Amino acid sequence: MNLNQEVIKKVIDYIEKHLDEEMELDNIARHAGYSKFHLNRIFTEETGTTIHKYLQLRRLTIAAEKLAKTDIPVAQIAYEAGYHSQLAFSLAIKKINLYQPKLYRNMGIFAPKQNRMEMAA
């Protein structure tokens, strides 16, 4: 594993540990010891996606699983996923799953869009 991969692993571990918290790229970069621009560049080079997109898709994947497998109210799931409005959450879920949250829930099928990334050793 090269240095960039070690840094990305550290970043992914940090993101996964704090998925349910407010996260700013500045804080993630500070944790990794890099500028946000450099960190985002190497993250994108190593993973093929930006930190923001990874974080967003991980949160939406967890939210989709909650929709499919629990009776937690949609508004609560939206809030837990970092959305301040149910409308914004509904649009984001529909964009990745093609269905509004209530319809997705009624289907009862969970199809993960972004699993946790693992860096090869």
Q: Where are the regions that the model predicts?
A:
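Terminal helix-turn-helix DNA-binding modules in bacterial transcription factors
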Residues: K9-D26, E45-A81, M107-A121
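…primarily DNA-binding HTH/wHTH and HhH modules…
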Residues: M1-N4, L91-A121
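Basic/polar phosphate-binding segments, predominantly the helix-turn-helix DNA-binding elements
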Residues: E22-L55, A78-Q100
